[in-house]
Curated annotation (Swiss-Prot):
Comp. bias regions, Polar residues: 435-452, 819-834
Disruption phenotype: Leads to sensitivity to nitrogen starvation and H(2)O(2) and impairs autophagy. Shows high intracellular ROS levels. Also shows higher mortality from phagocytosis by macrophages upon infecting mouse peritoneal macrophages. Finally, leads to significantly decreased colony forming units (CFUs) in two mouse models of disseminated candidiasis and intra-abdominal candidiasis.
Assembly notes: Homodimer. Forms a ternary complex with ATG13 and ATG17.
EC number annotated for this UniProt entry: 2.7.11.1
Keyword terms of this UniProt record: ATP-binding, Autophagy, Cytoplasm, Kinase, Membrane, Nucleotide-binding, Protein transport, Serine/threonine-protein kinase, Transferase, Transport
GO cellular component, one term: phagophore assembly site membrane
Catalyses which reaction(s): L-seryl-[protein] + ATP = O-phospho-L-seryl-[protein] + ADP + H(+); L-threonyl-[protein] + ATP = O-phospho-L-threonyl-[protein] + ADP + H(+)
Region (Disordered): 435-454, 505-529, 817-836
GO BP terms, alphabetized: autophagosome assembly; autophagy of mitochondrion; piecemeal microautophagy of the nucleus; protein transport; regulation of autophagy; response to starvation; reticulophagy
Protein's name in the database: Serine/threonine-protein kinase ATG1
Positions that bind ATP: I17, G18, K19, G20, S21, F22, A23, T24, V25, K41
Amino acid sequence: MDRFRIQDGKYVVEKEIGKGSFATVYRGHVTTDPKSHIAVKAVARSKLKNKKLLENLEIEIAILKKIKHPHIVGLIDCERTTTDFYLVMDYCALGDLTFLIKKRKELENNHPLLQTVFNKYPPPSKEHNGLNRAFVVCYLQQLASALKFLRSKNLVHRDIKPQNLLLATPLTNYRDSKTFHELGYVGIYNLPILKIADFGFARFLPSTSLAETLCGSPLYMAPEILNYQKYNAKADLWSVGTVLFEMCCGVPPFTASNHLELFKKIKRAHDEINFPEVCEVEDGLKELICSLLTFDPAKRIGFEEFFNNKIVTEDLSHYEVDENTELESKSKDLQESNMFVSEFLIKKRNQKGVSSRKDTEFIPKSKQEPMLDQAYKDETEMETGVKYGVNIAPEVYQNEMIDPEKLAAKLIAAKQLGSDEKLTNKNISHLLSSNSSRVNKLDKSNLSGKSDSSLDRDYVVVEKKAVEVNSLADDLAQANVGNNDEAVKDQNIKTLEQPHIQVHQPHNDIQNLQRAPSTTSGGTSSRRASLVERRLSISSLNPSNALSRALGLASTRIFGSSAQTNKNQTSNSTSPNYTQPLLNSQIFYDLTENLILHTETLNQPALINVDHAKGINEVIRILESLSAKAFVVYSYAEVKYAQIIPLPQAVIRASPALQFEKRLSDDSNPVIDEDSDEELDVQKNLSNTLLSETVNTRYRLRNDSSRNSYNKRNSFNKERFSFSSQGSNNSKRTNSYSSTLLPAEIISISKEAIVLYMKALQILAQSMKITSKWWYSCQEKICSLRLNILVQWIREKFNECLDKTDFLRMKLEEYENSKPGTHNQSPKSKISNDSNEDNVAEKVYLEKLLYDRALEISKYAANLELQGQNLHICELAYATSLWMLTISLENSPYTDQGEDEYDEFLKDTNDVLDSEDKIIIGKYIKSISHRLKMLRQKMAKY
């Protein structure tokens, strides 16, 4: 990019050296002194879309302004403009500590200065990435010096890790050891100087105070934070222990596929730290590491004891006896060249004949291995920390592209075969993993760091709600259902008066859970017993794609292709507490359908305060109502998601379950084919009309007065998005969405999907909060199988929504950051850039989305009812409409004391309905309820 100036021309900003989701870091220099190098962190205000991001940046600025220390990256200047924040900071040309550990061998060969440093202080072994003792003790003392200063200011950093420990060039503003120490530095004067960076998570925390915010990087996070307990400044000491261990051994002391597993692994270690046999670590360092990595913070070494440790206070002057004229010369050369550490690697590789193409250049480990547990990477993370070495600028290198279809097929195959092979494609993980905690375990035996969990990439805000949801679901999954005779008998897994699912006695033989013969239940809600036994796929309800994507695709993706298959396979869940009945896809099919049909639970009190005294039946009743609401919103979000991210053909070919799903979408399901041609035509018409109508968001129904032009718009949509089942056109349908949509349409659909997913998350989180209050007030810690199944379903949907929301957020950023005119436009639908911008800027209202969708579904259900066909589909459609309209009337349902993060996200969508709107919606609810009642009376006669 071209150079530019900031602070009225005081600083010249040069080449980009790092980039993240929220910030870009450039190198530069003082205008009047080109040899005075700086780093400039630029944060666009448009990227700080919520107050948490802005707050973290302001905290970082405030803290850096107050602290000045030689081993802390200093804030030189700061400028706020109407569009950006510019933080002028110390320039650290040698990147961060991860370069020395994970790229040591390449640096030995390619970097002139570091080559000399490593020759003087050679690594202890070629079998691991551990550093020479001189590095270890020097950086330990420098880190201790910085922490001691922070403690004097009552500051806790909360994100100590190698990526936040930057390395500055030595021998630049001094020439000898004496001057080095006079300037306030500690350690060895001829080694790169360590500086703590990134105070986005730091807080002023007096020694007597406790904090409870979850933040930091999982692999370096103290167990009390992982377990979302209150913590104090000693959490930083745990992180120091992990960094010290990694400097000695080349790998973190604990690795896991997700935060919960990491906590369990730390707890199971019982304070016994295992050092690899190939690493020779002196006893003093081992003792210090073990004292730092103590599980109980009360028993963990204190700051005073740490600062007075014999290694921390060791005299290192014996490392400084030799003159280092060569080191000084190369340091001066590096300073004059103003080159960043990664550029030397690229340069040397190109000189050796390696292709200079971006997709074959040097890729740091942090880019090679995407995060495994993306479900917990919340958008509130302060990703301004492209800390001059964590993320290298895209013009310096670019990741090698991987065929997503091949990786997706590999993911399906690995799941079916029970493979332990780790898959590392971030986008496929987002697209296909509905429970991101279900990731294969890491290979701990590899000491080179190549198989380390990429949880150490950048830094992560641990989504506290996700941790709580998964932890509670694990607790209930391991509950001894068999001992609760009365609960099981009382519930008898009767899914809302559903006699076709039963538990065979004795109760300890839960693995025999299976379907009973088909029966019909009496009363006004009578219907055929099961969707499977009706010879009709649940995915026939395409108005919201509700039961096709949500149950047909998501459930089979999570649980396997059938209940029988699940019986013969081991659960792929990370949690060892899962039992097969809880992961039975058929139970989830029936559970969700019946929850929607059980419209008697539509209206619940606005504030729920449950406890064990109210009994398990009350809890189940509340959860069923909330689950139904979450599911209908989730289902509509899935429609939006499918328009942007169609499934790759390789995924469908690799999975029998998804092949079945594809036949459903192609209207060639052999089960449906058994029905009459007339019934099939009705279903096809319902599917084509409704799904095609939702694809083009520019032509949605906007108000009642716009319905006169409905047929014209619908015709346009059908012309553009043909869903006919003829020949090859049908087979290509699933891949036609995103390639046909304009960028403005993709942005609009993404925003709508995010709002819907966030609403589903809000309801699901509230469900788990209610369950948590009841569960932890229980003395017996026993629950019914019915409640257990509900909780596991809520957990699965919560994790899936979290993954997809994060993916859509990144997709949205990608399109919003694209320059106008870079995307091809359809000749049939070219519109001006101004029109595009107006369309994108249109505000998304959850209530309107649900209102319009509910009316669409009920309208087509009424048409089907008039034809006297598919009454079971009509029943499900009417019930879905009622749930959607009810949700649109709610203002943060089931609220409790304290504001939830999802409530905060959706607060702009609350209170958008005036009294007249609510009256209209109430009339529709009354009308549709009457239709549903009449329909059920009609069905009861059959």
